[in-house]
Amino acid sequence: MTITPPTNPDEPVALYAEFTALPGRGDEVATMIAGLTVDVRREPGNVTFDPHRRVSNPLEFFVYEVYRDADAFQANITAPYGAVFNAALGDLIEGEGSVLTWLTPVPA
């Protein structure tokens, strides 16, 4: 799978992924994302991988991610454990998969 982030290839890639677990599957999704977090944070190109649940609806998940550059992001999305996670996640969430929102820093 190739996803091209809308940034200069040498700049950091920042995004958040969001998805909603099916009713009764939120804790299972939380356990899966906790395991994925350990793997992703070990990647040399990962800067930040912070999963969250919405307080008002714990079935809704948001993951804030930052990678060193586009190559580090591609390494993340092609990692074998990511493919296993995404395949399993598809049966536990609403819709077709995670919705990705690309981010760019606001200059200070």
Where are these regions (language model features)?
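Glycine-rich beta-strand-turn "strand-cap" elements at beta-sheet edges
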Residues: M1-E11, P51-L59, F85-A108
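Short, surface-exposed ligand-recognition loops at beta-strand->loop->(often short) alpha-helix junctions
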Residues: T20-D27
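Hydrophobic pocket/interface hotspot
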Residues: A17, V29, F49, V63, ...
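Localized chelating/binding microdomains
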Residues: A34, V63, E96
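Short, glycine- and small/hydrophobic-rich beta-strand elements in well-ordered beta-sheets
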Residues: V38-F62
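An amphipathic, aromatic/His-enriched active-site/gating alpha helix that lines ligand/cofactor pockets
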Residues: D39-V47, V66-L100
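Active-site-flanking beta-strand signature of metal-NTP-handling nucleotidyl enzymes
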Residues: V13-F19
